């Protein structure tokens, strides 16, 4: 525990130094592309973009290794809010709060009297991964019922639920799976990649292993066109980040580089057309 706290103190101090540097102005948000006839899609896009705004609009192209600037440590409260959405959340929140309190005590003891307060680096809360909790949170904020999109701390488990709904009732399923090379994502859809050592390359492969954990990542598509698929995801380099993926002339996401997790499914959001 003492070693962990020491590492946390070092990260907190390093984060403070990074935040003191000059930051380039954030890019403008994507222009909303969801029509009034698709209020459910619009609500999900709005929820994702609102969270992105809270984090300072970090934006990257493709698959960088680091962000241009570490997000503010005050975003810690946002991470806790995402965890509150999923069943596994209370235990994670309790551990985070205990660690946070211990770090704050250590920082208070290290700083001279009258020095500005230093908060623990946001990167400390990247584990356990909260990207699925983020997607669950924005779904809840958009008013998507839990029986339609079951909140989960693991992408693979809500992916299983969406695939099961599609398999049993394709006409009425709220999310329809598509092969990424066959379907151009639209705002309000989900685009998912498999981060496993031996990844899936098609959603049909997942049907053979329901309930088995796989490290995955899904983002909410917020804009498309112009040779890009723009999507917002959580815990991307420790933050809520808008990523711009290259797309072909038809708007379909191009395959990631060979050393990056492959896209294996795009879930078409049909919340506005199903009941």
Where are these regions (language model features)?
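N-terminal capping segments
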Residues: 25-147
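Low-complexity, Gly/Ser/Thr/Pro-rich intrinsically disordered linker/tail segments
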Residues: 235-275
């Amino acid at each position: 525990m003492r070693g962990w706290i020491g590492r946390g103190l070092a990260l907190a101090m390093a984060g403070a130094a990074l935040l003191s540097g000059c930051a380039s102005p954030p890019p403008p948000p994507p222009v909303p592309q969801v029509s009034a006839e698709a209020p459910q899609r619009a609500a999900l896009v709005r929820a994702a973009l609102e969270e992105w705004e809270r984090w300072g609009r970090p934006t990257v192209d493709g698959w960088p290794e680091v962000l241009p600037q570490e997000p503010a440590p005050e975003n810690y409260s946002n991470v806790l809010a995402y965890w509150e959405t999923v069943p596994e959340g209370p235990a994670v929140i309790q551990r985070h709060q205990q660690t946070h309190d211990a770090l704050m005590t250590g920082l208070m003891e290290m700083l001279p009297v009258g020095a500005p307060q230093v908060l623990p680096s946001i990167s400390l809360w990247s584990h356990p991964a909260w990207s699925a909790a983020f997607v669950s949170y924005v779904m809840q904020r958009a008013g998507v019922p839990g029986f339609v999109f079951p909140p989960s701390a693991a992408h693979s488990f809500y992916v299983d639920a969406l695939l099961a709904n599609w398999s049993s009732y394709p006409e009425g399923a709220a999310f329809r799976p598509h092969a990424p090379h066959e379907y151009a994502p639209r705002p309000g859809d989900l685009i998912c990649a498999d981060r496993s050592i031996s990844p899936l390359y098609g959603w049909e492969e997942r049907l053979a292993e329901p309930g088995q954990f796989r490290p995955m990542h899904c983002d909410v598509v917020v804009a498309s066109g112009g040779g890009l698929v723009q999507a917002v995801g959580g815990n991307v380099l420790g933050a809520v980040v808008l990523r711009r993926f290259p797309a072909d002339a038809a708007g379909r996401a191009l395959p990631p580089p060979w050393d990056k997790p492959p896209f294996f499914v795009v879930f078409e959001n049909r919340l506005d057309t199903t009941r």
